[in-house]
Every structure is written in structure tokens, then in C-alpha cells.
């Protein structure tokens, strides 16, 4: 593996005018057990993955209290505390996990307050750099949920506010209450349903964090749909893996894009970081339209 691997090769992005991060981050959902439930199969390996990510130039780490639940946040603190000064930790609240496979909404203000304060404790932070509403709750007015995050920010517990799994209309409602510095929606080569949200983020200089940037693993083979076959051909032309080509496509797709591929493997992490140095040509991007 190239000794010069560095996430900084992807360039930088500024969150909220004051948090500069390298534009290839790390999603910490996979440092948990099967089904994003419980401890990872090998805790020591999960710790090494997190530490290696930082050594390879990752300065933005995304997690959520529901990953494990609580496991991912605890492992981040175990692996990285005391944090280097340039490390930005983002977490999320608003989904609860009563059991494996269950993802239930709870974005009531009281729950978000309790969740944020618990995340502060687990992450061993005085203030969360970026706190994201994990998803709008159909039973709670969006303004109530975001309003509580605004109060937490005014109390110094949150530095910046982001949202996840939102439409343009929902994002506009949030922005009427407070500046939104990031949006985290599902987005990858095959799933571009959030193209309109990405376009809005570009107009407003809001960071766009694509979750499932590798299509939940579907991009590993480069076979299947026409888009994936085209991705396989682009990967072959650059001598890289299909997964690396998928990350490179995201980085080239928009300057507000901040991919956060996750993994529980050091080897896979290094492959992902190598994608920061890949430059796709206009011809490549046309082939992947």
C-alpha cells in the first residue's frame, strides 16, 4: 500500500465557515456488530481502523448514537481520545434501536436533548462539532425537533447543526430556523434520488454527506446494472477497484460532496483512502452520467 496515502489528497471543505476538514471522511457505522448491533467481532481491530483512519489524514468522522446502539461512539472515544485538534466528530440523534433490525423515530425535543447529552458523555466532548437530526419524525413537527437543537447550540453543547434523510422542502423549513451546515442523504452512482437536494446544497454551500456511498457494498463487483458495468470499465482504465472508482466519482461529482465510506477492515480502509488521489476525466464522468 502506498506510503503516501492521505485523505487530504481529496481536497478540503469548510463546515459552517470555521471547521476545515479533508473531503474524504470516515463513517463509523461499521465498527459495530452484525446488523449494526452490538460490539464488533474484534474490538481491537475496530480500534485500529479508527486510529489508522486518523493517521491517514481523515479529519472528519461521522457516527450516531443508534450505531450499536452507543457502541460506535464509545469506540471512537476509546480509540481517539484525547483527540487531535483538527479532528471533527459528527454524530446524530433521532432514531432509536429497541432491537436488531429496528430503527424507530424519536425526534421529540426531550429525547433529542437526552440523546445529545449522552453523546457528549460517550464521546468525551464538551461540545459536539456537528450534531445531525438523523431523520424527521413523522409524529413530531420538524420545527420542534430543530428548535431543540437550536437551544442546545445556544447552550454551547452543539457547534453546528446538520440534518439527514430530508427533502428540499424539509431542508428549507430547517433553514428558516437556523443555519444548516450539512445534509446526509443516501446517494451513490445508482441511487441519485437526492439529486435535487444536492443541487440545493451546492447553491447554498451546504456540505452533502452521501450515506451508502458504495451502494451498501453493491459497487464491489462492477457487475449488474448498466451504471455499475460502466463503473467497472472506468475502474479498469485507471487500474483501481470499483469501490475506489465509486468514491472518486462522488468527489468529482460536486465540490460540496464529503464522502464518508465506512469499514471494519484496515485493508479496506486503505483502499478507500487511496481513492482520494484518483482523478476521473471528463470522459469518465460522461460515461457515468
Roles of regions detected by a PLM:
Residues 16, 55, 77-88, 120-124, ...:
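Acidic (Asp/Glu)-rich catalytic clusters
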Residues 38-45, 71, 75, 103-114, ...:
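Alpha-helix N-cap and loop-to-helix initiation/capping positions
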Residues 120-138:
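Active-site groove signature of glycoside hydrolases
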Residues 32-36, 96-103, 216-220, 268-271:
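A short acidic, helix-capping loop that chelates divalent metal ions and anchors anionic groups
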Residues 39-53, 107-123, 167-173:
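Short, acidic/polar
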Residues 86-99:
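A short, structured active-site edge motif that brings together acidic residues
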Residues 7-12, 136-289:
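Beta/alpha (TIM)-barrel catalytic core signal, keyed to glycine-rich beta->alpha loops juxtaposed to Asp/Glu
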Residues 1-87:
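N-terminal binding-site loop/beta-alpha segment at the start of enzyme catalytic domains
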Amino acid at each position: 500500500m502506498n506510503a503516501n496515502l492521505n485523505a487530504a489528497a481529496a481536497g478540503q471543505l469548510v463546515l459552517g465557515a470555521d471547521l476545515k476538514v479533508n473531503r474524504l471522511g470516515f463513517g463509523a457505522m461499521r465498527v459495530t456488530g452484525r446488523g449494526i448491533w452490538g460490539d464488533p467481532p474484534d474490538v481491537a481491530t475496530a480500534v485500529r481502523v479508527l486510529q489508522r483512519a486518523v493517521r491517514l489524514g481523515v479529519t472528519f468522522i461521522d457516527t450516531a448514537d443508534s450505531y450499536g446502539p452507543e457502541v460506535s461512539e464509545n469506540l471512537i472515544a476509546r480509540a481517539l481520545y484525547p483527540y487531535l485538534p483538527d479532528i471533527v466528530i459528527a454524530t446524530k440523534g433521532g432514531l432509536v434501536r429497541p432491537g436488531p433490525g429496528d430503527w424507530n423515530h424519536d425526534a421529540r425535543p426531550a429525547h433529542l436533548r437526552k440523546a445529545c447529552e449522552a453523546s457528549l458523555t460517550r464521546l468525551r466532548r464538551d461540545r459536539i462539532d456537528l450534531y445531525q437530526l438523523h431523520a424527521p419524525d413523522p409524529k413530531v413537527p420538524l420545527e420542534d425537533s430543530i428548535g431543540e437543537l437550536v437551544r442546545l447550540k445556544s447552550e454551547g453543547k452543539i457547534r453546528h447543526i446538520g440534518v439527514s434523510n430530508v427533502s428540499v422542502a424539509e431542508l428549507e423549513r430547517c433553514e428558516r430556523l437556523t443555519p444548516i451546515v450539512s445534509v446526509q442523504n443516501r446517494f451513490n452512482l445508482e441511487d441519485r434520488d437526492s439529486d435535487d437536494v444536492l443541487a440545493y446544497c451546492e447553491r447554498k454551500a451546504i456540505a452533502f454527506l452521501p450515506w451508502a456511498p458504495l451502494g451498501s457494498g453493491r459497487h464491489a463487483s462492477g457487475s449488474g446494472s448498466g451504471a455499475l458495468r460502466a463503473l467497472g470499465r472506468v475502474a479498469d482504465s485507471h487500474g483501481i477497484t470499483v469501490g475506489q472508482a465509486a468514491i472518486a466519482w462522488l468527489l468529482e461529482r460536486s465540490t460540496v460532496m464529503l464522502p464518508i465510506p465506512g469499514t471494519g477492515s484496515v485493508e479496506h480502509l486503505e483502499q478507500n483512502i487511496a481513492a482520494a488521489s484518483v482523478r476521473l476525466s471528463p470522459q469518465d464522468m460522461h460515461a457515468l452520467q
